[in-house]
UniProtKB/Swiss-Prot annotation:
Gene Ontology BP term (one): isoleucyl-tRNA aminoacylation
Coiled coil: none
NCBIfam families registered for this protein in UniProt: ileS
Protein known as: Isoleucine--tRNA ligase
PANTHER family reported in the protein's UniProt record: ISOLEUCINE--TRNA LIGASE, CYTOPLASMIC, SOLEUCYL-TRNA SYNTHETASE
Amino acid sequence: MTNANTRSTPYSAVKPDVNLAKQEETILDFWDQEKIFAQSLNPEGKKTYSFYDGPPFATGLPHYGHLLAGVLKDVVPRYWTMKGYTVPRRFGWDCHGLPVEYEINKTHKIESRKDVFKMGVANYNDACRSIVKRYSTEWKTTVRRVGRWVDMENPYFTMDVSFMQSVWWVFQQLFNKGLIYEGYKVVPYSVGISTSLSNFEANQNYKMVQDPAITVMFKLVNQPDTAIMAWTTTPWTLPSNLALAVGNDIEYVKVQEKATGRKLIMAQALLSSVFKKADEEVEVLQMMKGTELVGLTYEPLFPYFGDRADKGAFRIISSDHVTTESGTGVVHMAPAFGEEDYYACAKAGIPMVNPVDDDGMFTMEVPDYAGKRVKEADKDIIADLKKRGNLFKQDTIQHSYPFCYRSDTPLIYRAVSSWFVAVEKIKEELIANNKQTSWVPDHLRDGRFGNWLEGARDWAISRNRFWGTPLPIWRNAEGEVMCIGSRAELEKLSGQKVDDLHIEFVDKITIPSPTGKSPLKRVDGVLDCWFESGSMPYAQWGYPETSVEDFKKAFPADFIAEGLDQTRGWFYTLSIIGTALFNQAPFKNVVVNGLVLAEDGRKMSKSLKNYPDPMEVLNQHGADALRLYLIDSPVVKAQELKFSEKGVYDIVRKILLRWWNSYSFFANYANIDGFVPKGDAKKSPNILDQWVLSRLNGLIANTHKEMDAYRLYNVVPHLLQFIEDLTNTYIRFNRSLFWQDGMPETKRYAYETLHEVLVTLSRLMAPFAPFMSEVTYKNLAQVLKDKKDSVHLESFPTADLSMLRPELEEAVKAMDTLVTLGRNHREKIGVKAKIPLNEIKIIHRSAELLETLKKFEPFFVDELNFRKVVYNPNEDQFVQVTAKANFPVLGKRLGPKMKAVGAGIMSMSLENILKLEGGGVVVIEGEEISLSDVEIRRAPKGDNANLSVHQIVSIEVDPTVTPEQEREGLAREIMRKIQVARKTADFQMDDKITLEIACDGALLDALNAHKDMITGETLTKNLNILALTAEPNGKHTETSDIDGQVIKIGVTNLPR
């Protein structure tokens, strides 16, 4: 090792101890000052890579779900930027809709639409506008701190006129294509916020609840003491009952109760569930098909709509949706409150009644319950049915029920007048376009999302609300209709100036009738905010009024990413609108992440305080750690993650600090030796250099392959494993080489290799851990002629496939395994690692692998501390090899043949087992079996306590320990104590020292026997051995013990 004072120091000194989080703050300032993000966006000579960012609401603080999606949206664009593309990243804000209105309603104690009109729609919308950017500062801080690069200074807002008129254009295009219609439809409805919800909104908040489950008797007309029975969990819908439905082909039965004489009709298959002891309780009178019941009439339960009997109500009809899975096989029909009810009654010509207002309260049409919320009226309705003699049985049922995802109140299903997108008209095109997209995980495309498309219903896109993009339809009493596509069009047709497109502005504007009839006024309602976010690919540019070229470059998106819930949200609405406009999916690749839960497996909750504050985690452990933790977890496979702060810390401890230590090791030793690279690492004849360069280039190739396919879950684990291999294998086995004096070629090549690896690693890791990558690159690349201002302005590394040496990689895997086996075996026989053993026998069937492994012997023999290594390819002499069926894999494939094939695998010959290990195929019971179908096991033959067996390699150890070997072991322990003293004294790595040692007995014998080894390894120039009773002198002194024997050490560093 060369004295650092005699050479220049090419690199900044690196302290082994580092505060990663503080260091990241410095890098953030560097990026801001040098405008690195802006530089990376330079489009000169580059192709455009298009990315759409789904807009969040700024009415809430960012949580781990946002951070996860944000990291994914950062990693992929960074990667493609380094691949030579320009990747515009424009942030957007979702401004309209229920989330904003809900906040205002809470603040102003608004409980109904009347309260809004009392406040004034303009004032209400001004209040909504005022909170849209409430947490935008916190969002900017968090997004910046996590290391995400996105343009938040020039965002789009869905409430901007330019955005809203693009949404109008989208609506107009669909309208002109006949894909917009007005009609009634039973939809999920939130009484908490007085508006309908889309199906995908309704699916977001299911809860287990207890509801009444009652069986009701409907008395048949002209059939004394005879009733047909129906079962329901929504008693509040019974005042609106207009029909009963049966299944045409279902067998029904008329029975007579022995106790009461009543005659009751129900499905024969459900008789035993209605009567627990049917044989004892009832007598069967008649069997009949459902067709025989159709047309019978019954008495209304309540008098409110009795006059509807003249219009065909209160009769039995047939419906395909009736089953015998539960209840009575007879379904009570309230067409205003059930989708199937609505369609069946419409088909039967029975008009609906809807005695429930927009706030979920009964109207005066049902005076006994008027003013009551529907669910609150259940008890009163049940009591009245009991009084009237219509209640047969009352139970309670526990079931999963949808709640409003905003107000957390139970949803009802309610017929509303709405405007719809005719999704069912374009369903086949939707499904076909989806087939052209790539999903990660891939099963979602044809699974969860594909299934959702298969069952797609027409989309109710109007909302009876205030803060949103108004429906752009004007019409008059005579039925003339105009659909407006822009502000300019509205101004032209109305002759009035239009400053804003919100309802308080446009509702004042009328359009003269082109035929001289009454003026056209805008229809009530605003567009679902999902329609706005689904229009984002067009509206973010103000297309088609402006930015036509920007839109064309960016459509369709190369990449989007959001959570699993968006398969029924943003991904869905994007697909509908893209298909409706251009018959094209608006994205090519989509990465779907799972849900981040609290560590206890529950949903993260502010009230429960069951998760750490994201900013505290970032400031404690750093953004790189959080990023790597998230993207190296099941959540990037759309699975759940139970968030653990310990998991983030483990990334710091196991990955980032190891990476830092490798970097620190290189920089500090290279400074001591004044090393500047020539760039010829690839010419190194050293086998460990060749191995690590092979690993590096294989890693680069894999990263390209998997990142191009957006499979982050196949990228990050390999990157992290490489960091571990770099520190635990390459540097560990090469450490003594860097300690040598001077600069022999082997040492120079090791420096060349480590520099090449660390600089390349900084580029490889840049998209994933942008801070550490920047720090290491800035320091290590400063000696390179073609260095960039930032690692993020570098190109992504490309693999040199000529450097791949799979035989070396296989040998090093075997070396790592045998080192572990050697340590474990020492522990088993109670011999410390410092004591040399005589012989280790390395056993593997492949003579070629053993021959390659022999080349690594100089590296692992010292680590294992054996004096002799023997290589034995005769595995059969030591090891029993067997195979067992991989039941989870084969069971699905083979079904009933599994037992026979499993037995065949168990009795398979060694020749066939080895054939499988070599990549071949074996036929058993007519089935082709490959390596993935079996589990191959190795076990020791006989009773050999000195044998340790592993799938990769096995060893046999000579456990003999002589007194001379014990002395050498003690000498190595003494060396370790001296090195600890040097470090405690804070000496430089290359400082020469004067050493004073006081000891006696076996320690003194070991010191005298191995004096040269101890002084050489510890850079000792002067050694004084003292009696144990003496006290050594030195700049640093300490007293310790080895195996219970006292040793005193004094160290002084010599002048340079």
